């Protein structure tokens, strides 16, 4: 059965379908190993590290006039727009078909091993792909299109193994089920920020299969930083280099776009092709962002922040919450914990001695943020080992509604202790916790929700010289961390522990995530993460192979409606 047709030429705009690709017929055709490099002049060292022309007619754009020397240059909107213009010119100069697609190595310089593909077909098709590299697991995905079947296609292919020959097979399927395939080769560059391309696998306690998706490994202590997408076999399938700090989390909107922090003053919005579409730059504001940010339904990002003025004048850090308007980029402070908890600030006079804020005052150290009902904010305060619920009053000013934590920490701190919910049952509170996660369920009553967290179970609290966590916590503190899940009942002003299990100890950082009926846990200071069953049985552990032992967070995403269908 022959279903091959000539594929027509289409000038494909980058504003058009962000992530469409097509393949169709069964033809296993190896293209020549011709390399096409657009630049005739020397590219910068960074560009050379992020692109490769090795493979089957692989194009590399000419960046020589763009003065790209560092990742901060890559994440400038003006640079991205010039890259887009050059890519459009290349598209218009090509007769891109399914059997001879336009292939460009990492054109926007935001994914070291990524490929841009563009082509058109006479007949509407949907596209899938498989990547094979000798000695490595295969990687197969269905690509996201704006329509299920389409004739104009452009995509980012992720999943190539760095610095080895990858055979990429595209499959196009028509609406009546007919298929066509084509193949090409690509050898990406080495990863630009790490010498390791995989994580060590170990220790299985359950034979359940791992969930579908890629682990986003966020934050390390390497000189050059990146966020990595890691498959279930432990291999890095994408490297997204950043400027400094860490990406905190990946946040998606409904327009097939992803927000990613690239520094402590900049969050960018990327489309599925890897193109930077918006830059939220706080460099000229009074704020540095840290730890966490989320998207609300008012076209705003809500972010944890440090006031530069307060840091300089009073020494206070990591105690503000701001909103960033995505339309106007206006930054508004919505919470200042010095004003919300003045009695605590009178008590918490100890100087930070252990973290990156050494030498400053860190009375609350807000490290995680969740949005409960588009108004109520749930925040994790590491330094007080407390989760706080904030809600705006009639004037729109956020106030502390209630708290969850050890009452011993709040004894003698004004009337703050009266805000604590009652603990239902006998269990030890969390200490130094990170990464809270809010969830609802159909079987819960009004006013009830689940709250999961990584209980670091740490006894470090530099801000309070009047009490010692070591004297308050139980004997496991400082030895074993825990995954914990609470059922919170706002109507009875109480909460209870419904699930808990031990995980490797990490005094700082770390994360938990409830994902596809499994639990993802990162013990950051041991540079290890694992996927567990819903009952706490380990399915697989992943451990960083380098000597640097630090992973800020690990969250898993399926990337559906972004890269994949």
Predicted ranges, named:
Residues 48-51, 55-127, 131, 152-154, ...:
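Histidine-/acidic-rich catalytic cores in large beta-rich domains
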Residues 1-13:
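N-terminal Sec-pathway targeting helices
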Residues 19-36:
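Membrane-interface motif at the C-terminal end of an N-terminal transmembrane signal
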Residues 35-50:
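Short extracytoplasmic/periplasmic juxtamembrane "stem" segments immediately C-terminal to an N-terminal membrane anchor
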Residues 9, 149-150:
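N-terminal processing/targeting junctions
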Residues 13-19:
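N-terminal leader/presequence segments that precede the conserved core
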Residues 134-148:
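Solvent-exposed serine/threonine-rich low-complexity stretches and specific carbohydrate-binding patches
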């Amino acid at each position: 059965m022959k279903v091959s047709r000539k594929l027509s030429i289409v000038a494909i705009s980058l504003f058009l379908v962000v992530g469409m690709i097509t393949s169709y017929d069964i033809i296993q055709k190896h293209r020549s190993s011709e390399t096409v490099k657009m630049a005739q002049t020397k590219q910068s060292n960074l560009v050379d590290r992020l692109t490769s022309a090795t493979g089957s007619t692989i194009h590399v754009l000419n960046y020589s006039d763009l003065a790209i020397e560092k990742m901060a240059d890559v994440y400038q909107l003006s640079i991205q727009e010039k890259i887009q213009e050059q890519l459009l010119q290349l598209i218009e100069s090509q007769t891109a078909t399914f059997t001879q697609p336009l292939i460009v190595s990492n054109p926007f310089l935001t994914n070291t091993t990524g490929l841009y593909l563009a082509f058109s077909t006479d007949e509407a098709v949907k596209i899938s792909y498989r990547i094979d590299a000798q000695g490595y697991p295969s990687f197969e995905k269905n690509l996201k299109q704006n329509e299920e079947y389409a004739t104009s296609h452009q995509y980012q292919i992720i999943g190539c193994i760095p610095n080895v020959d990858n055979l990429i097979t595209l499959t196009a399927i028509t609406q009546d089920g007919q298929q066509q395939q084509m193949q090409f080769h690509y050898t990406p560059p080495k990863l630009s920020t790490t010498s390791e391309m995989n994580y060590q696998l170990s220790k299985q306690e359950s034979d359940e299969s791992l969930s579908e998706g890629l682990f986003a490994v966020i934050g390390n202590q390497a000189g050059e930083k990146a966020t990595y997408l890691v498959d279930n076999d432990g291999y890095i399938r994408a490297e997204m280099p950043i400027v400094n700090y860490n990406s905190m989390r990946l946040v998606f909107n409904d327009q097939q776009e992803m927000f990613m922090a690239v520094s402590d003053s900049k969050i960018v919005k990327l489309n599925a092709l890897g193109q930077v579409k918006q830059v939220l730059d706080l460099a000229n504001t009074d704020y540095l962002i840290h730890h966490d940010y989320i998207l609300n339904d008012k076209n705003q990002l809500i972010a944890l922040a440090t006031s530069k003025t307060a840091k300089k004048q009073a020494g206070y850090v990591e105690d503000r919450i701001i909103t960033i308007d995505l339309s106007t980029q206006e930054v508004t402070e919505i919470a200042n914990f010095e004003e919300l908890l003045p009695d605590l600030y009178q008590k918490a006079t100890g100087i930070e001695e252990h973290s990156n804020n050494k030498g400053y005052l860190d009375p609350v150290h807000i490290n995680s943020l969740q949005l409960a009902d588009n108004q109520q904010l749930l925040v994790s305060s590491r330094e007080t080992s407390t989760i706080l619920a904030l809600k705006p009053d009639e004037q729109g000013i956020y106030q502390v509604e209630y708290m969850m934590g050890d009452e011993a920490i709040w004894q003698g701190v004004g009337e703050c202790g009266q805000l604590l919910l009652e603990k239902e049952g006998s269990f030890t509170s969390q200490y130094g916790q990170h990464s809270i996660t809010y969830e609802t369920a159909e079987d819960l009553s009004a006013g009830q929700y689940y709250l999961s967290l990584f209980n670091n179970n740490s006894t470090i609290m530099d801000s309070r010289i009047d009490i010692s966590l070591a004297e308050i916590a139980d004997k496991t503190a400082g030895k074993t961390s825990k995954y914990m899940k609470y059922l919170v009942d706002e109507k009875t002003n109480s909460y209870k522990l419904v699930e808990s299990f031990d995980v490797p100890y990490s005094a700082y950082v770390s994360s938990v995530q409830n994902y596809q009926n499994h639990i993802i846990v990162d013990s950051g200071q041991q540079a290890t993460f694992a996927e567990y069953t819903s009952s706490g049985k380990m399915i697989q552990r992943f451990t960083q192979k380098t000597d640097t032992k630090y992973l800020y967070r690990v969250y898993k995403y399926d990337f559906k409606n972004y890269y994949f269908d």
